[in-house]
Amino acid sequence: MAHSKEVPSFRWTQSLRRGLSQFTQTVKSDVLKDAKLIADSIDFNQVAQVQRALRKTKRGEEDLNKLRDLNKEVDRLMSMRSVQRNTVFKAGDLGRVERMELASGLGNLKTKFRRAETGSQGVYMGNLSQSQLAKRSEILRTLGFQQQGTGGNGVVRVWDVKDPSKLNNQFGSVPALTIACMTVQGGETMNSVIQALTSLGLLYTVKYPNLSDLDRLTQEHDCLQIVTKDESSINISGYNFSLSAAVKAGASILDDGNMLETIRVTPDNFSSLIKSTIQVKRREGMFIDEKPGNRNPYENLLYKLCLSGDGWPYIGSRSQIIGRSWDNTSIDLTRKPVAGPRQPEKNGQNLRLANLTEIQEAVIREAVGKLDPTNTLWLDIEGPATDPVEMALFQPAGSKYIHCFRKPHDEKGFKNGSRHSHGILMKDIEDAMPGVLSYVIGLLPPDMVVTTQGSDDIRKLFDLHGRRDLKLVDVRLTSEQARQFDQQVWEKFGHLCKHHNGVVVSKKKRDKDAPFKLASSEPHCALLDCIMFQSVLDGKLYEEELTPLLPPSLLFLPKAAYAL
């Protein structure tokens, strides 16, 4: 369906920022680390050659090869990149209506892109090569026919290549690359570039910066003179100094602001991201316009989110991804036949990952089904809510528990947490089965009450999984109270968890007058912490033998066997 009404573009952007704020983060240090590495390592003679090629009105195979080779080198240098991860949303990942909306949206995006790429305003393309199409246009102009589908400046830049699919994902700006190029090619210090782009980013929090704004800011920040005043167009590369590239870079280095540019898609949050996006879309009446032209904020977000299920949709390197959004994210609208009564779907259930088979999902469903929603259920995690590495659910009545692990995305943050809190080593959880933690959260009974010691992280974890229905009771023990049974619990139940093998060092500095005490202490294990908290409430050590509800074979990927 075509929509002719005007899009309130910036209002939509602000609404999406608010609605997806829980998925945004501060990424300035990561962007600058990549920018410095690119500035120090890349051959800027190659950059200049690519920029020259992209200024040509007709570009061929050699030009594309130069662009792809340079993009590959940039991708190799960057830590912030999107990787190839195809996703199929099925029943349980999203509600049926949400899946239908997503399928329709991706279909409309595909139509919009195809029309833009083929110049479809009633012009039959036929099975012609780019060079033949260009020749045909030249003949039509000679005969006095008006060229259809050209831009306002009459310039049509043409890629004459044998395989057009090689053009996919080779364009679009990357803030780290923009900052590096502005610094080196502009002969500036990186600090002055950062200050200038930060000003643009701050302006972007209240309006779309335009060329008049750029002129005014250039008076204060001389380095912005490098930003081109040409109108943006499709298929411009990250090596162009466009205003939109500068604004995106500025947005990425703001310390806060809930900027969409700082969203990261992971296998654990993908379905929650899509749910939240659809909620904002419905509330604001957003739509996809199939007519060729610039993408509106909703179209832009949906396309970027669905390009890869793992990476940085706006600001990461994505040149090594194959395919488009509608190729890499697909929707299964069928209903699977089930034997016996079907469990009601949980609105908050997260994305089913390819690593979990139907049998594994059935085992997890059975395990969660054994938890009694009418009795106390403790839940604790290790690691931040946005990147947890361990989760435990412990039900004292019945002596049952679910205990699982997850490989982190943020290795630096993980090492810091290991040193000062949980003592988990990467080698001990790198084979953790992906998807178990999120699947368990998605299966918890609706409106269940969960008991915690400190609820902020748990609330955020549930919100990220779309489980706002779950209720939390925070017992609010002091640090001393919570660790009262520390040694006794580790002695009795330490055999239940063998994944806390690092040395934990206290962050607190010792008072110079205090007696000497070893800085190391017992690590925090999510399962054993739950037992400690229950012991504190009981006023004595919990003594019952515990039963795991998940088999060990489900928690970790099988080790490869080597024959000698």
Curated annotation (Swiss-Prot):
One annotated Gene Ontology cellular component of this protein: host cell cytoplasm
Signal peptide location: none
Swiss-Prot/TrEMBL keywords: Capsid protein, Helical capsid protein, Host cytoplasm, Host-virus interaction, Hydrolase, Inhibition of host IKBKE by virus, Inhibition of host innate immune response by virus, Inhibition of host RLR pathway by virus, Interferon antiviral system evasion, Manganese, Metal-binding, Ribonucleoprotein, RNA-binding, Viral immunoevasion, Viral nucleoprotein, Virion, Zinc
Domain of life: Viruses
InterPro entries: Nucleocapsid_arenaviridae, Nucleocapsid_C_arenaviridae, Nucleocapsid_C_sf, Nucleocapsid_N_arenaviridae, RNaseH-like_sf
Stretches for region Binding site for the cap structure m7GTP: 54-236
Enzyme class per UniProt: hydrolase
Residues the entry annotates as binding Zn(2+): E390, C497, H500, C525
Domain comment quoted from the record: The N-terminal region is important for the cap-binding activity while the C-terminal region contains the 3'-5' exoribonuclease activity. A CCHE zinc binding site is present in the C-terminal region and may thus contribute to the substrate binding and/or the specificity of the exonuclease activity.
Protein function: Encapsidates the genome, protecting it from nucleases. The encapsidated genomic RNA is termed the nucleocapsid (NC). Serves as template for viral transcription and replication. The increased presence of protein N in host cell does not seem to trigger the switch from transcription to replication as observed in other negative strain RNA viruses.
Name of the protein described by the UniProt record: Nucleoprotein
Organism (species): Junin mammarenavirus
